[in-house]
């Protein structure tokens, strides 16, 4: 037996009643009729919605961000939303899209007072007094509610249909409400006494006025004020999803990518801001916790590290890597070979083509259809990013594989000849400790940071990376040998014998030195294509190399303390290279800074021009003193080394000067930065801190590889920072150094003098407007803004004379408004008692007849704005937003 649902009076089955939730309208609901005017920060259009006309002010978010005016847009919206006065333009809606902010206000058909002034030439005294009186009431209302206009001028005074004045354009205003406005602020804003007009707002208007303006919303994301536009959501989803252009049927995967990759707050800065936290956490996870991992681990390049710093792009990289891993697993492919094997075994062109196809999301060699690609993409898992071998190889091969391959062969032959010549030198130290041959692959195994041609594959940062990635046992953690140069009294600083002690790593330094001196190095640091370019991930193959490493991860800590406070640091880098640089000072690795023509006894020790200039400027004395500290510390461990006087020997002095300059060449690295590492156990840390204000330009003949950013300037001896430290202290905030905002002719002197200012700046501007109404020209007008500012500071007012002379009351009213001392400047109270405003009915101004009442041809007539536009050569015929 069936049951019949009870019906309502209309004959419809009774059920739960749906209550429509109020929501703000969309900007699509407004129809643009014509443009009205254009200002410094936006354009004003005449719009229509439901048969009613509005003035729509359009401001581009990108322009507001570029001009650093984001907070001013918020202030303008708040000031208009809080105001309920017959002398202030009424704001109905505050809307926004992905690119623009829209302020929907009432349309005043009479135009602005500036246009009327251009037509009249100047106003008579009665007309000027009425306009100034209504503007004074508007200013008093704003000041009582904590709002300072700061841009009062005839251009921002609009004429209503009845001829009354209404202030507009609060783009430079200041709202003392130190929080976002809420519903209570708008509902309980007091209005004028017994107004005839109702200033109530609809729920949709209230919601739009208290909504947050998202200036950093991701591109294409749906704005919070328009939650019910389903069609727009679908279209935006298609634009953003990377898979929508490939396979639109794959809805679950597209939805997953959309939610995970772009699930951010509307106010989250995604594109213009770089987040450093993910990169630092990944750095700790990879290199900081353990060194026992023997897995192949590739480093990100500088461009890739930036991508991973962004939450959105990081997830894209993650899914791409997971896709590659899943594809390789499903096809049972063998693991990728190491980067050295790939680079040495294949032709560069073939290698480039294969690697491009391997890293590309859409492989050109894949004979499958789009459906197959979608199936593979559906296998994406949520495993973290493990390796970037293929991506790192592609980045390297695309940038320098051709040049590196061509020059590598020639450099190998040249180095072999130089090595034989250097090995033939018979010194006591060589006889005592013969040099062991070095494998070519240990020297040419990685191109390294591309500082210059000679330094392509000899980056000192490689040794630090090996330390972090190996658990090999170190044998040289106790004492280190020292370069002992022969004494010489010649002025040419000759090196009579080059004595080196050593192991494989020391002969490796000889070869590096020989390679580096074949070409004159530029003084300007070259740009590094990749700050993190260690392409070789085959750790097991280099066990012997790592066993002979000069660095001990347990005993020799990096100079972590310098990474935060050192003014020698370059942008986008870390102090990890200084870990290796310390060893270069203590050891005989300083020979890499010497210039060699031929490896003979009569070679000359030369310094780079930068270092020579530093010596002439008196830097050498401090360096020598610090050299003594280093040598004394090393002599305690070396009994077989003869004592040398560093002060009396020019050769030794310059050698150690080069050492210290080499050490202080601190280069930051963006991804492998040791974060919480102490430098207490460093034997040379104190001496290095004493000379940290040496210029990084004095780096010997070893040019520094830095990013294409500005180098940090030389820090003075006083230690004064070039930028004020960020304020994290408690207590009262310091006085903010504000910019000078406004139109030059109407600026108060305290604004020009960058003094703290208040509501008195508006009364000064009102005095300027009164003078302009009576004369047709602002009192401080001149040819250039600089001359206008001088006239304001001198209070140079050209009073009319003869028949054009102003009345005494008018001149006195202007004087009290243009008082230089802001504390003695007149306000509404003084104007009410002034003789010029004697017959003004202040309590009933909005009902008084006005001298000018606009007579438009129709409701869409904008001709009253044309006079000002023509005077300022503004063309508003276009509809471009």
From Swiss-Prot:
Phosphorylation at Thr-743 by CDK1 during M phase activates its kinase activity. Maximum phosphorylation occurs in prometaphase. The active site is at 151 (proton acceptor). Its EC number is 2.7.11.1. It is found in: Cytoplasm, Cytoskeleton, Microtubule organizing center, Centrosome; Nucleus. Residues 1-20, 310-345, 706-732 are annotated as: Disordered. GO terms for molecular function: ATP binding; protein phosphatase 2A binding; protein serine kinase activity; protein serine/threonine kinase activity. Signal peptide: none annotated. It catalyses: L-seryl-[protein] + ATP = O-phospho-L-seryl-[protein] + ADP + H(+); L-threonyl-[protein] + ATP = O-phospho-L-threonyl-[protein] + ADP + H(+). One of its GO terms (cellular component) is cleavage furrow. It comes from the Eukaryota. Residues 312-321 have a biased composition (Basic and acidic residues). Keywords: ATP-binding, Cell cycle, Cell division, Cytoplasm, Cytoskeleton, Kinase, Mitosis, Nucleotide-binding, Nucleus, Phosphoprotein, Serine/threonine-protein kinase, Transferase. ATP binds at residues 36-44, 57. Residues 30-837 form the Protein kinase domain. SUPFAM superfamilies: Protein kinase-like (PK-like) (SSF56112). The modification Phosphothreonine is found at residue 743. PANTHER family: SERINE/THREONINE-PROTEIN KINASE (PTHR24356), SERINE_THREONINE-PROTEIN KINASE GREATWALL (PTHR24356:SF1). Serine/threonine kinase that plays a key role in M phase by acting as a regulator of mitosis entry and maintenance. Acts by promoting the inactivation of protein phosphatase 2A (PP2A) during M phase: does not directly inhibit PP2A but acts by mediating phosphorylation and subsequent activation of ARPP19 and ENSA at 'Ser-62' and 'Ser-67', respectively. ARPP19 and ENSA are phosphatase inhibitors that specifically inhibit the PPP2R2D (PR55-delta) subunit of PP2A. Inactivation of PP2A during M phase is essential to keep cyclin-B1-CDK1 activity high. Belongs to the protein kinase superfamily. AGC Ser/Thr protein kinase family. This is Serine/threonine-protein kinase greatwall. It comes from Gallus gallus.
């Amino acid at each position: 037996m069936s049951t019949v649902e009870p019906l309502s009076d209309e004959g419809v089955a009774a059920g739960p009643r749906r209550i429509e939730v109020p929501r703000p309208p969309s900007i699509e609901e407004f129809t643009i009729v014509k443009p009205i005017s254009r200002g410094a920060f936006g354009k004003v259009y005449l719009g229509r919605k439901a048969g009613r006309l509005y003035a729509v002010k359009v401001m581009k978010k990108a322009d507001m961000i570029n001009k650093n005016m984001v907070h001013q847009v918020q202030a303008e919206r708040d000031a208009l939303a809080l105001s309920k006065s017959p002398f202030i333009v009424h704001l109905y809606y505050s809307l926004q899209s992905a690119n623009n902010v829209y302020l929907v206000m009432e349309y005043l058909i009479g135009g602005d007072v500036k246009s009327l002034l251009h037509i009249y030439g100047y106003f008579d005294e009665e007309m000027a007094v009425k306009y100034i009186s209504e503007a004074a009431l508007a200013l008093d209302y704003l000041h009582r509610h904590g709002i300072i206009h700061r841009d009062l001028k005839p251009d921002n005074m609009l004429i209503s249909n009845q001829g009354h004045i209404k202030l507009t354009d609060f783009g430079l205003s200041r709202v003392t409400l130190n929080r976002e406005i809420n519903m209570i602020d708008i509902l309980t804003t007091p209005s004028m006494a017994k107004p005839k007009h109702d200033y109530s707002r609809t729920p949709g208007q209230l919601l739009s006025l208290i909504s947050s303006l998202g200036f950093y919303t991701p591109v294409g994301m749906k704005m919070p004020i328009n939650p019910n536009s389903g069609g727009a959501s679908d279209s935006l989803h298609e634009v953003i999803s990377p898979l929508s252009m490939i396979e639109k049927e794959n809805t679950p995967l597209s939805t997953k990518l959309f939610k995970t990759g772009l699930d951010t707050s509307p106010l989250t800065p995604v594109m213009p801001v770089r987040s450093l936290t993910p990169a630092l956490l990944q750095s700790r996870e990879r290199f900081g916790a353990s060194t026992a991992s023997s897995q192949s681990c590739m480093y990100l390049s500088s461009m890739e590290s930036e991508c991973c710093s962004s939450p959105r792009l990081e997830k894209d990289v993650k899914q791409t890597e997971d896709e590659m891993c899943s594809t390789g697993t499903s096809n049972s492919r063998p693991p990728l070979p190491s980067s050295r094997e790939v680079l040495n075994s294949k032709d560069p062109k073939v290698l480039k083509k294969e690697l491009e196809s391997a890293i590309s999301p859409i492989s050109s060699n894949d004979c499958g259809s789009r459906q197959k690609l979608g199936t593979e993409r559906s296998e994406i898992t949520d495993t973290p990013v493990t390796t970037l071998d293929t991506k790192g190889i592609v980045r390297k091969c695309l940038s320098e594989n051709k040049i590196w391959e061509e020059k590598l062969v020639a450099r190998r032959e040249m180095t072999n000849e130089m090595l034989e010549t250097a090995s033939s030198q018979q010194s006591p130290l060589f006889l005592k400790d013969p040099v062991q041959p070095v494998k070519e692959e240990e020297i040419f195994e990685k191109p390294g940071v591309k500082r210059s041609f000679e330094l392509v594959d000899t980056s000192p940062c490689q040794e630090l990376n090996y330390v972090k990635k190996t658990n090999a046992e170190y044998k040289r953690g106790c004492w280190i040998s020292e370069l002992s140069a022969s004494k010489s009294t010649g002025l040419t600083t000759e090196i009579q014998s080059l004595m080196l002690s050593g192991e494989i790593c020391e002969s490796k330094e000889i070869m590096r030195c020989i390679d580096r001196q074949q070409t004159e190095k530029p003084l300007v640091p070259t740009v590094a294509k990749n700050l993190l370019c260690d392409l070789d991930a085959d750790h097991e193959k280099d066990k012997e190399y790592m066993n002979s490493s000069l660095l001990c991860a347990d005993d020799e800590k990096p100079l972590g303390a310098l990474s935060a406070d050192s003014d020698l640091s370059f942008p986008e880098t870390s102090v990890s290279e200084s870990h290796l640089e310390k060893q270069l000072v203590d050891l005989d690795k300083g020979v890499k800074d010497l210039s060699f023509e031929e490896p003979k006894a009569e070679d000359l020790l030369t310094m780079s021009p930068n270092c020579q200039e530093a010596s002439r400027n008196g830097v050498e004395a401090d360096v020598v003193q610090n050299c003594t500290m280093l040598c004394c510390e090393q002599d305690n461990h070396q009994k077989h080394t003869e004592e040398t006087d560093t002060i009396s020997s020019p050769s030794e002095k310059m050698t150690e000067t080069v050492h210290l300059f080499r050490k202080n060449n601190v280069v930051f690295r963006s991804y492998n930065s040791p974060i919480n590492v102490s430098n207490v156990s460093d034997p040379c840390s104190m001496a290095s801190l004493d000379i940290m204000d040496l210029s990084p330009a004095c780096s010997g003949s070893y040019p520094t590889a830095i990013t294409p950013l500005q180098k940090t300037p030389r820090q003075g001896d006083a230690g004064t920072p070039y930028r004020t430290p960020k304020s994290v202290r408690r207590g009262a905030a310091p006085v903010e150094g504000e910019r000078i905002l406004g139109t030059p002719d109407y600026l108060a002197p305290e604004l020009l003098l960058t003094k703290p200012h208040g509501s008195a700046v508006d009364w000064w501007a009102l005095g300027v407007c009164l003078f302009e109404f009576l004369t047709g020209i602002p009192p401080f007008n001149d040819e250039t803004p600089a001359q206008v500012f001088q006239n304001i500071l001198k209070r140079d007012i050209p009073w009319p004379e003869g028949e054009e002379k102003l009345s005494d009351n008018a001149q006195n009213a202007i004087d009290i408004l243009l008082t230089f001392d802001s504390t003695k400047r007149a306000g509404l109270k003084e104007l009410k008692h002034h003789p010029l405003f004697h017959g003004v009915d202040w309590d009933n101004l909005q009902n008084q007849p006005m001298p000018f009442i606009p007579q438009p041809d129709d409701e869409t007539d904008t001709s009253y704005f044309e006079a000002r536009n023509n005077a300022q050569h503004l063309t508003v015929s276009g509809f471009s937003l």
